[in-house]
From Swiss-Prot:
The gene is CDKE-1. Residues 366-397, 438-475 are annotated as: Disordered. Residues 19-337 form the Protein kinase domain. The modification Phosphothreonine is found at T29. The keyword Kinase applies. Disulfide bonds: none annotated. This is Cyclin-dependent kinase E-1. The modification Phosphotyrosine is found at Y30. One of its GO terms (cellular component) is nucleus. Induction: By auxin. Down-regulated by cytokinin. Keywords: ATP-binding, Kinase, Nucleotide-binding, Phosphoprotein, Serine/threonine-protein kinase, Transferase. ATP binds at I25, G26, E27, G28, T29, Y30, G31, L32, V33, K59. Belongs to the protein kinase superfamily. CMGC Ser/Thr protein kinase family. CDC2/CDKX subfamily.
Length: 475
């Protein structure tokens, strides 16, 4: 981990000498995101990764609100990302801290795109749907990465299109990376209450058990979000666009529930036995008493036949009862992924031979801003690429960006010195070979992975990624 010591005869931290700054590519509630390039290759650099000139996204965190330590959001990301390693999870390359002002910088491999921008490009520029092969490949890879996280007892808790990055260049072209672990948590069995963590998951992708105040929840909340993302890939617009209530730290989200009920119908205790135990269920009953929700038909909104494998998978992701909701491991075994077109490692390939690869837009780079966030650099030519881990666009967007930011109300840890967390050097991470997660067989209802006890010897290693051999033509 780089420190904040001054080097090179300047008043800038020595670790900055590793990078050639290109400019700022994003800004959010957490801080700033910069695009930089490596000046020298890493000792264990792989082909196209960690070599001289390789693009790197550097995420600078603001100080904690208390002003006496490192941002707790950054601590969460570091403690999880330094322990996990998978092809479909964003890779933490290095951690740097400037002791002078306790500013923290996380360096990631740079991804040129994210699902939010890909969906927006098809909706607003091309006016064409995303081809079935790309939709299936993006979804398969998302589930593959999520299965790895859930197998290691990690709940992401903030899955949404802007947090799903897509590589646009090099050997990893078309590979997705799950990013932004600021709200992620490790969960255990027996489950401990997680409600004290505050509001989680951006509202359009928030599971009904969270909206109804569940004190205990599982990785099933991530699968609901995946279902929402799947529908958005199919229709190019968010499935449940509720208006968020913000009157109190954790208000009753009636409008969001209303949007869900209008599509899926009203949940019942018969189909969801634990529904009556949820704290906000009585509030819901009072608000909608006498209101009849006619099931408008999810298949009509996503334009899928009710008997199609795609609709069956989507319906199982959007199951009200979290205990019955399909898991990532089960979803990977679904018939939908066994049918043509088969999913592949490069999700951005054309669906048919002879078709052109879609050229997705380049994110503007502010080349006048330095690492401290001040305006000082001379403008340079903007590089290709448009996304970075957890970034926020510098371009106005038609869909409200509050839906793309972490939720307000999350509990915060006190300011903390990094040394207390034993943040080790990241050289080992840089030398790892990402990917290779086993394809787990789907579990039955009686052995649901959400309820299994964590194995004491369970590690976070990697195995075979599980792509069928016939898919090699898609790589």
């Amino acid at each position: 981990m780089g420190d904040g010591r001054v080097g090179g005869g300047t008043n800038r931290p020595a670790w900055l000498q590793q990078y050639e700054l290109v400019g700022k590519i994003g800004e959010g509630t957490y801080g700033l995101v910069f695009l930089a390039r490596l000046k020298q290759s890493h000792p264990h650099a792989a082909a196209g990764v960690g070599r001289r000139g390789s693009p790197i996204a550097i995420k600078k965190f603001k100080q904690s609100k208390e002003g006496d330590g490192v941002s707790p959001t950054a601590i969460r990301e570091i403690m999880l990302l330094r322990e996990i390693n998978h092809e479909n999870v964003v890779k933490l390359v290095n951690v740097h801290i400037n002791h002078a002002d306790m500013s923290l910088y996380l360096a990631f491999d740079y991804a040129e795109h994210d699902l939010y921008e890909i969906i927006r490009h098809h909706r607003e520029k091309l006016n064409l749907p995303i081809n079935p092969y790309t939709v299936k490949s993006l979804l398969w890879q998302l589930l593959n990465g999520l299965n790895y996280l859930h197998s290691n007892w990690i709940i992401h808790r903030d899955l949404k299109p802007s947090n799903i990055l897509v590589m646009g260049e090099g050997e990893e072209h078309g590979i997705i990376k799950i990013a932004d672990f600021g709200l992620a948590r490790i969960y255990q069995a027996p489950l401990k209450p997680l409600s004290d963590n505050g509001v989680v998951v951006t509202i359009w992708y928030r599971a009904p058990e969270l909206l109804l105040g569940a004190k205990h929840y599982t990785s099933a909340v991530d699968m609901w979000a995946v279902g929402c993302i799947f529908a958005e890939l199919l229709t190019l617009k968010p499935l449940f666009q509720g208006v968020e209530a913000k009157a109190t730290p954790n208000p009753f989200q009636l409008d969001q529930l209303d949007k869900i009920f209008k599509v899926l119908g009203h949940p019942t205790v018969e189909k969801w036995p634990t529904l009556a135990n949820l704290p906000c269920w009585q509030n819901d009953q009072q608000h909608i008493q006498g209101h009849k929700y006619e099931n408008t038909g999810l298949h009509n909104i996503v334009h899928l036949p009710q008997k199609s494998p795609a609709f069956d998978l989507l319906s199982k992701m959007l199951e009200y009862d979290p205990r019955k909701r399909i898991t990532a491991a089960q979803a990977l075994e679904h018939e939908y992924f066994r049918m043509d077109p088969l999913p592949g490692r490069n999700a951005l390939l054309p669906s048919q031979a002879g078709e052109k690869i879609v050229q997705y837009p380049v994110r503007p780079v502010d080349t006048t801003t330095d690492f401290e966030g001040t305006t000082s650099l001379q403008p340079t030519q903007a590089p290709s690429g448009n996304a970075a881990p957890g970034n926020q666009s510098v371009v106005p967007r038609p869909i409200p960006r509050q839906m793309q930011q972490p939720m307000v109300g999350m509990s915060r840890m006190g300011g903390t010195n990094m040394a207390a967390f034993g943040a080790a050097p990241q050289g080992g991470i840089a030398g790892m070979n990402p990917g290779n997660i086993p394809m787990q067989r789907g579990a039955g209802a009686q052995s649901h992975p959400h309820q299994l006890r964590r194995k004491a010897d369970q590690g976070m290693g990697m195995q075979n990624p599980g792509y069928p051999t016939q898919q090699k033509r898609r790589f």
